[in-house]
Amino acid sequence: MHLTCTKPFDWQKLLKFFAGRATPGVESVAANAYRRSLRVDGRHCIVEVRPDPAGDGLLVSCTAGEGDSVTAVQEFARTVFDLDAPIAEIQSVLASDATLRALLKTHSGVRVPGAWDGFELTIRAILGQQI
């Protein structure tokens, strides 16, 4: 499936973020792709996310099959990779500050990485503070 997003989109920064926090046996980052196991609607599936070569979004594959499970994976991926961020608005606000404006030149399209569920996000936050 193809998920669109507004440009710019800094896939490499997101991938680096997830690579540094990948849970062994659950997630991996390799060959410009993010992969993970996931439970959707009570079924186990493998999700792979990679950039669309056309540059206008992400390609997501999933072993969940069809229907509601695929829709759930699409929604999760949109959240995890922050695909619906209002980039123009964000950049406009950041550009109003001289220091942040300078950073936009080298960090344009940065997104806020999410998590596949609230429990996972909580555990990552707690462990991140401990390390």
Stretch-by-stretch model annotation:
Residues M1-I131:
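HhH-family (HhH-GPD) DNA N-glycosylase catalytic core used in base-excision repair
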